[in-house]
């Protein structure tokens, strides 16, 4: 004869309908997905702004290194070109810093604040689950006495069990109703909450790249040499490189 395990303290009577439990799991599942997506977006936005700042800071560092290059002491044209580049890179870095500050304030911080709500929500769900377990345990206790022979002591214990069950059942039903009412409202509020942030993100990017267009347009006008195409510059570089390789100090043994 095989032994069939059973759950201790579980009621035979279904205390929560499958429809209610299915609705609860669906709504909570949507919020769990929203929590994960919000945290991932916050993390990706932080990585993006950090990378943007690193890029513009590196560009300024390169232009500063070029300014300290000995070539600038000997060639005024080169000095003029590098000075123009350095000015452009500093302007780019300044606008980039403004963009990052704006995104931090209007996008990343709201994402962070929104994410901070989920621990309280998850705790409310845990309290609901604990209330459900208590409800099930006491319901099973009532059923146990209901199945016994109705003697005086049994009826007394049955009455006591029912009295213990009533507030626990009411507590679960209140928690369950509150979550079923408020979880869809919380999920639906995400659109109104995040729309201003995403609009601000788009505006910050548009302003930044509009300024970059102006900055690099000005730089192009300062650096362009009429009559020199990219192919001509490449040929000139190759010619000069060949001359350097022909020097005896760099010739192969």
From Swiss-Prot:
Keywords: Cell cycle, Cell division, Coiled coil, Cytoplasm, Cytoskeleton, Septation. CDD domains: BAR_Bin3. It is found in: Cytoplasm, Cytoskeleton. It holds the Pfam family BAR. Residues 227-241 have a biased composition (Basic and acidic residues). It comes from the Eukaryota. GO terms for biological process: actin cortical patch localization; cell division; endocytosis; myoblast migration involved in skeletal muscle regeneration; protein localization; regulation of lamellipodium assembly; skeletal muscle fiber development; skeletal muscle tissue regeneration. PROSITE patterns: BAR. Residues 16-57, 120-151 form a coiled coil. Residues 222-241 are annotated as: Disordered. GO terms for cellular component: actin cytoskeleton; cytoplasm. Residues 9-232 form the BAR domain. InterPro entries: AH/BAR_dom_sf (IPR027267), BAR_dom (IPR004148), BIN3/RVS161-like (IPR046982), Bin3_BAR (IPR037428). Involved in cytokinesis and septation where it has a role in the localization of F-actin. This is Bridging integrator 3. It comes from Mus musculus (Mouse). The gene is Bin3.
